Regions:
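Aromatic "clamp/platform" in nucleotide-sugar-dependent glycosyltransferases that forms part
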Residues: 183
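A charged, aromatic-enriched C-terminal amphipathic alpha-helix characteristic of glycosyltransferases
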Residues: 235-246, 253-288
């Protein structure tokens, strides 16, 4: 089996997990990596003045790139995981080669769905994942005891990175719906993982969720940039609490036939993101994208 080394900047983080799902050998030495899985804003700032880096930067971000345009290096070997990231970087003159989606490695515990809702996420700097909203809204409907919160806010039942893969999928499969209410996602892996076991997302229909999820969408009512300080400015979307209440009520009163149809639909959609047995060859993916572009211009 081919060994591909992937640089990630952290250990208990989604980038580390992504590298494992893609079948890569993790390294924290950027000069030794063939692929760099990182937030592109942070990567292009961190290595702004270092020339001898040759990895393919495969990134996704929730930062507003416009706010960092004068701090970022030009980097040709750069792909993103979502189309909204692609458009954002293209607008500031740092055009990625293409979009290459992330992948999942689902497990399928044989358990009944004995919970209503689940959410999973780690909010940093501010509650970007809307974990507190999940806690509050499920209490409002008196279903907090039928809700699983995995995270670091919102009175979580489990810490984000404390679970094994089997434990995580055991929680996914127990829930009927995934509350994907994050204000911004560069890609949005957890609800796709949940879809693989038939758990239906109730999701904010924006950012990475809009292009990757299916289920019960809630359209955004506002879009803006939130700066928590001079160094951290995020592109965020807001949802209507009224529409959220409507969809939760819809979920609570949904017929068995409607739910089973939706569950089958989301499970089928998730198969688009399944990882292969071999380490993911991002160079092959880039070659295929180039051929598709060439055919489109003929």
């Amino acid at each position: 089996m081919t060994t591909i080394k992937a640089y990630v900047p952290c250990e208990k983080c989604s980038y580390y997990q992504t590298a494992l799902y893609e079948g890569y050998q993790v390294t924290h030495n950027v000069f030794d990596a063939e692929v760099c899985i990182d937030d592109p804003i942070m990567f292009l700032k961190r290595f702004r003045y270092i020339d001898d880096i040759s990895c393919v930067l495969w990134g996704d971000t929730v930062y507003n790139a416009l706010y960092y345009v004068n701090e970022l290096r030009k980097y040709e070997n750069f792909v993103v995981a979502s189309y909204w990231n692609y458009l954002m970087f293209s607008k500031i003159g740092i055009k990625p080669i293409t979009v290459v989606k992330r992948h999942i490695k689902p497990l399928f515990p044989n358990l009944k769905k004995d919970k209503l809702f689940i959410t999973l996420g780690e909010s940093r700097f501010f509650d970007r994942k809307n974990l507190t909203l999940v806690d509050n809204i499920t209490r409002e409907f008196n279903v907090r005891n039928e809700t699983i919160i995995v995270g670091n806010m919102g009175n979580p039942d489990y810490s984000t990175f404390s679970l094994t893969e089997n434990e995580k999928y055991t929680l996914y499969v127990r829930a009927k719906f995934f509350l994907a209410l994050s204000k911004s996602e560069g890609f949005g892996l957890p609800p796709i993982e949940a879809m693989a076991v038939g758990t239906v997302p109730i999701f904010l229909n924006a950012h990475g969720y809009k292009e990757n999820l299916t289920g019960l969408p809630i359209d955004p009512i506002d879009e803006y940039t939130e700066c928590v300080d001079n160094d951290h400015c995020f592109r965020v979307w807001e949802l209507s609490k009224h529409e959220l209440r409507y969809e939760i009520q819809h979920a609570l009163t949904m017929s068995r036939d409607e739910y089973e149809d939706l569950s089958e639909k989301v499970e089928k959609k998730s198969r688009e993101y399944y990882a292969t047995m071999e380490p993911f060859d991002i160079y092959q993916a880039l070659r295929l994208r180039e051929k598709e572009r060439d055919r489109a211009t003929l």
